[in-house]
């Protein structure tokens, strides 16, 4: 007979992991409420608009390789700009469900508009460093600047 010695007994309160996931991803009822009132649709449009603006900014002369700008510096500028969009959505959307819908639409539209830029702007390693700086809550601008300098 098979024994399961590592079985854990769960108490009546939800675990901290469940609470943390709900904070990060929202819940189904919240999503349905936001969808019904039109906020999900609006946030998807916002994500698409932001992607178009992002591509426009990134294709300007100051974000192309030249004597003054190396490939790595350009990549880091793109990552920082992409992170800024993500942090702005998280900060200014009314809740995480709306922010996640806008975030998904941003990356979906970016992938359609410019695959190379999409790949440059979604480096999860660099994003982790930026999010650590952002979520600390104090001196965010200084910490994000230090992160940018470190990655360059």
Segments the model singles out, each with a brief description of its role:
Residues 22-69:
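Short N-terminal edge-element motif at the start of the domain
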Residues 98-123:
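Mature extracellular/secreted ectodomains of secretory-pathway proteins
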């Amino acid at each position: 007979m098979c024994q399961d010695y590592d079985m854990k007994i769960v108490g009546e309160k939800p675990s901290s992991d469940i609470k943390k996931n709900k904070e990060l991803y929202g819940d189904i009822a919240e999503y349905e409420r936001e969808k019904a009132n039109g906020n999900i649709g609006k946030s998807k449009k916002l994500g698409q608009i932001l992607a178009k603006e992002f591509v426009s900014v990134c294709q300007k002369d100051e974000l192309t390789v030249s004597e003054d700008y190396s490939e790595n510096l350009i990549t880091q500028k793109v990552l920082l700009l992409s992170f800024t969009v993500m942090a702005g959505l998280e900060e200014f959307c009314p809740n995480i469900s709306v922010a996640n819908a806008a975030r998904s639409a941003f990356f979906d539209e970016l992938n359609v508009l410019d695959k190379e830029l999409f790949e440059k702007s979604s480096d999860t390693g660099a994003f982790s460093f930026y999010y650590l700086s952002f979520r600390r809550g104090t001196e965010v601008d200084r910490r994000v600047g230090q992160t940018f300098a470190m990655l360059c």
